[in-house]
């Protein structure tokens, strides 16, 4: 019997988290436990170590609103060297089909603009503080058919009550990620093998692309991308509440209740006019998958910490 070698992810005290569910702007700190302390707290789940992620909390002070925006683009710094049309014809490598095609360049999405927008709200007094953030991101990959869109929102609220005897922390977060995964490295491999005099487009074709069918080992890599759909959607909805009671003599009792709903959906479709459909006499092919996971956790602990002679600290935790 083997335990997982992957580290246990603990987000704001809730074990079993997923780093993909957190926006980078919301992370305050990341700590790694890899010694006996990991096993002492989390047991056999921590056999591969523990990654502790703490999200940002509000700071005391006036309510502040901030905005961060990013714009970016990508370029290929160095491309593979292949024969262009003139060299291909001059050396008599193959049949001259009349076109002049940069197959590698046809698959690139150079110059496309990616953007990211984040709005933060933070502030409050000693008794009640709030931190909230909203993020939207549209990332254009350098390859056609390799794009991603992300949306997320988070609210962290903290309360100190009864002269700091009682501390309450509330967290809720929603994140959604859409991924276009039509691209593949195999298409770039094919682009390096293609005849540079072959046509990319065909005005007589219903698709508009020169779809190469038959027994040839070569195919139009751009048509391969454009005549199919490969969408993946991830959704996370999380909420947790922590109640901490500060007791005399260095003792404290804490309980954390967490809830997480994760949904994952795949939608893949290949057109009836795609090369693989025509070669296989298919009228198109589709695939849809959906999964949903709900996790509920409860973590009660009792803590002890005392400082002796200003230099010596003794701490213990049980839970």
Located regions from the model:
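Long hydrophobic segments that form regular secondary structure
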Residues: 120-123, 244-249
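Short, small/polar-rich motifs associated with maturation and membrane association
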Residues: 1-155, 160-161, 166-169, 175, ...
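Intrinsically disordered, low-complexity regions
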Residues: 104-105, 189, 249
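Surface-exposed loop/interface segments of Gram-negative outer-membrane beta-barrel transport/assembly proteins
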Residues: 59-100, 142-146, 152-238, 256, ...
């Amino acid at each position: 019997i083997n335990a997982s070698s992957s580290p246990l992810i603990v987000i704001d005290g809730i074990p079993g988290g997923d780093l993909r569910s957190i926006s980078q702007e919301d992370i305050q700190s990341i700590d790694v436990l890899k010694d006996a302390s990991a096993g002492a707290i989390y047991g056999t789940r921590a056999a591969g170590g523990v990654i502790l992620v703490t999200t940002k909390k509000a700071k005391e002070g006036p309510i502040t609103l901030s905005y961060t925006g990013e714009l970016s683009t990508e370029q290929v710094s160095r491309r593979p060297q292949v024969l262009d049309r003139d060299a291909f014809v001059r050396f008599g490598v193959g049949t001259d089909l009349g076109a002049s095609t940069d197959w590698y360049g046809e698959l690139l999405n150079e110059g496309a603009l990616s953007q990211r927008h984040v709005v933060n709200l933070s502030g409050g007094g000693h008794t009640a503080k709030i931190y909230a953030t909203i993020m939207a991101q549209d990332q254009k990959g350098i390859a056609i058919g390799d794009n991603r869109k992300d949306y997320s929102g988070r609210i962290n609220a903290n309360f100190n009550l009864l002269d700091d005897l009682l501390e309450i922390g509330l967290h809720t977060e929603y994140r959604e990620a859409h991924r276009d995964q039509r691209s593949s490295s195999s298409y770039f491999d094919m682009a390096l093998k293609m005849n540079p005099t072959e046509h990319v487009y065909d005005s007589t074709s219903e698709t508009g692309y020169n779809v190469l069918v038959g027994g040839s080992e070569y195919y139009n890599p751009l048509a391969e991308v454009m005549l199919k759909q490969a969408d993946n959607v991830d959704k996370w909805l999380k909420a947790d509440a922590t109640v901490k009671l500060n007791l005399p003599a260095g003792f404290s009792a804490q309980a954390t209740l967490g809830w997480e709903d994760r949904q994952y959906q795949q939608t893949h479709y290949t057109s009836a006019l795609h090369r693989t459909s025509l070669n296989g006499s298919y009228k198109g092919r589709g695939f849809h998958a959906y999964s949903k996971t709900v996790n509920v956790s409860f973590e009660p602990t009792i803590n002890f910490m005392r400082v002796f002679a200003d230099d010596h600290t003794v701490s213990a935790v049980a839970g």
